[in-house]
Amino acid sequence: MRRPDFTQLLKVLDRQVPDRPVLFELFLHGPAHDYAVANGAKNLVDVYAALGYDYVSVVASDFGFPSMQGSHRGAAKTHSLNDSPVITDRASFDAYPWRDPAACDYSPLDGELPPGMKFMARGPCGVLENAIKLVGYDNLCLMLYDDPQLAADIFEQVGSRLAEYYRIAARHDSVGLLMSNDDWGFNRQTMLSPADMRKYVFPWHKEIVRIAHEAGKPAVLHSCGYFADILDDLFDMGFDGRHSYEDNILPVEESYELLMGGTLPGGKMAVLGGMDLHFLCTSTPEEINRRSRAMLERASERGGYALGSGNSVPDFCPVENYLAMISAINED
């Protein structure tokens, strides 16, 4: 087991070449988690350390936005974007029990870490995701036209509270990185128009980046979906790295050239993960290892890359496929 060294991930996020390959996932569950536990890991920190990560991904507190989603579906694994809205008009907005991030429990950030390891504090979903959870996707799209002031007020309440959540998390010495996780796109378009994204969503992400940088810590974006029409916005928000890539949108190899570019270190945004989930789950271990090694080789002189899945390793991914991916870091 290699020793954790968070400075290697910092080099990646600074778009430099790390001293050795770096691994990255939004979080670990399913086969990756189970494999580590079966081999002696006793807690979440052990899982990340045993598998070769330099950080532990955690939700920093019990803060969130209560909704009806999941309350009547038992163990359902999927849900509609229009499922169980709780804010439908001004009256339900005024009655909603908005939680105070400062009144929540941040004790997950007090956990003991091995030398060289830090926490990555991710959110309880993001600005757009929580607005959709509270209102419903179709309802939100209609609200932007029928009652734009109410829509603006909802985004204000969600965004300002998430910013405070990250501000509190960033104060902890154990936190080395803030992760703003917020899905923005379908396969061929953004979930809202780019103009509406710029008006309601992006300013809060820019504020989260500012909070991270003011605390001397990098900020990373996890956002699934199409992003070609908002590429300049991504750069303007100032994120140090981006996570989540799909082959049917833009393969990680092409994304790396787009975000890092050139032939030297110092591109615009580090690329994290990117092994497409369909590829990861359905290819042979040999094919996965070959593509993983090729991606590391592509970044070997320019840096700014950490190896991992395109999103997160799902329950149905064969464990040997996951191991074939991460084993690439140990090969010349």
Model-derived features with residue positions:
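Catalytic domains of carbohydrate-active enzymes, especially glycoside hydrolases
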Residues: 41-62, 168-173
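An N-terminal assembly and electron-transfer interface module characteristic of large anaerobic redox
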Residues: 70-72
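N-terminal substrate-binding region of glycoside hydrolase catalytic domains
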Residues: 52-57, 82-93
